A protein has these predicted regions:
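A detector for short, charged/polar N-terminal pre-domain segments
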Residues: 1-2
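N-terminal core-binding DNA-recognition domain of tyrosine recombinases/integrases
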Residues: 5-20, 26-86
Length: 86
């Protein structure tokens, strides 16, 4: 996924998020990238709400709790905001 490494560096160095938070965002974005790859999507501009909902549903069925799902959504939102600025 385009810009993922730069985004994580931005979180660590410019936003000064804790290493644990950056690691959690990395895992969340990895899960997001895996979900997109399942649909043959490698360009973040091609993502729509159905892809995100599919990921949320899948992660919920895998036992991810509500707070973790909220963090996943936050990671995705933050990633897209970062891409819009870049």
């Amino acid at each position: 996924m385009r810009g993922r490494t730069a985004f994580l560096d931005y979180l660590a160095h410019e936003r000064r998020l804790s290493p644990n938070t950056v690691a959690a965002y990395r895992r969340d974005l990895d899960a997001f990238a895996t979900e997109l790859a399942r649909h043959g999507i490698d360009d973040p501009r091609r993502v729509d709400e159905h892809h995100v909902r599919g990921l949320i549903t899948r992660r919920h069925r895998q036992g991810l709790g509500p707070r973790s799902i909220q963090r996943l959504l936050s990671a995705i939102r933050s990633y897209y905001r970062y891409l819009m600025r870049e």
